[in-house]
Amino acid sequence: MASRLLRGVGALASQALRARGPNGVSVVRSMASGGGVPTDEEQATGLEREVMLAARKGQDPYNILAPKATSGTKEDPNLVPSITNKRIVGCICEEDNSTVIWFWLHKGEAQRCPSCGTHYKLVPHQLAH
């Protein structure tokens, strides 16, 4: 078992030595522009890159992050983004509660959870695309 491992390591080492040019410089091109392993920013493409750039600016275009909780009073309600004029909302009410209270939230004034009285307000939201 150990001899197989040593033979495998020896083969890899000889391949690495053959990959060098006549002057001893490596012929293999690195993936990153600066050399070495690319960073997440250099490697990300598409939607992942768009989300990373938005996060760097402090934005959340696809609602990936949890909403910021407020006190939930009538003067400072929890803001619920929606692309329509109504949205269904789930309230846990208490920290150790295992039941979710679901209710419809409509555009306009802040509305209360029927169970605990926490206030929620629907705010318009535009999609990123």
Swiss-Prot record:
Compartments where found: Mitochondrion inner membrane
Main location: mitochondrion
UniProt GO molecular function: metal ion binding
Protein name per Swiss-Prot or TrEMBL: Cytochrome c oxidase subunit 5B, mitochondrial
Ranges in a coiled coil: none
UniProt keyword annotation of Mitochondrion present: yes
Assembly and interaction partners: Component of the cytochrome c oxidase (complex IV, CIV), a multisubunit enzyme composed of 14 subunits. The complex is composed of a catalytic core of 3 subunits MT-CO1, MT-CO2 and MT-CO3, encoded in the mitochondrial DNA, and 11 supernumerary subunits COX4I1 (or COX4I2), COX5A, COX5B, COX6A2 (or COX6A1), COX6B1 (or COX6B2), COX6C, COX7A1 (or COX7A2), COX7B, COX7C, COX8B and NDUFA4, which are encoded in the nuclear genome.
GO annotation terms (biological process): mitochondrial electron transport, cytochrome c to oxygen
PROSITE patterns: COX5B_1, COX5B_2
Pfam families xref list: COX5B (PF01215)
Function: Component of the cytochrome c oxidase, the last enzyme in the mitochondrial electron transport chain which drives oxidative phosphorylation. The respiratory chain contains 3 multisubunit complexes succinate dehydrogenase (complex II, CII), ubiquinol-cytochrome c oxidoreductase (cytochrome b-c1 complex, complex III, CIII) and cytochrome c oxidase (complex IV, CIV), that cooperate to transfer electrons derived from NADH and succinate to molecular oxygen, creating an electrochemical gradient over the inner membrane that drives transmembrane transport and the ATP synthase.
Residues the entry annotates as binding Zn(2+): C91, C93, C113, C116
Record pathway: Energy metabolism; oxidative phosphorylation
Gene3D superfamilies: Cytochrome c oxidase, subunit Vb
Transmembrane among keywords: no
Membrane topology: Peripheral membrane protein
GO cellular component, as recorded: mitochondrial inner membrane; respiratory chain complex IV
Lineage: Eukaryota, Metazoa, Chordata, Craniata, Vertebrata
Organism superkingdom: Eukaryota
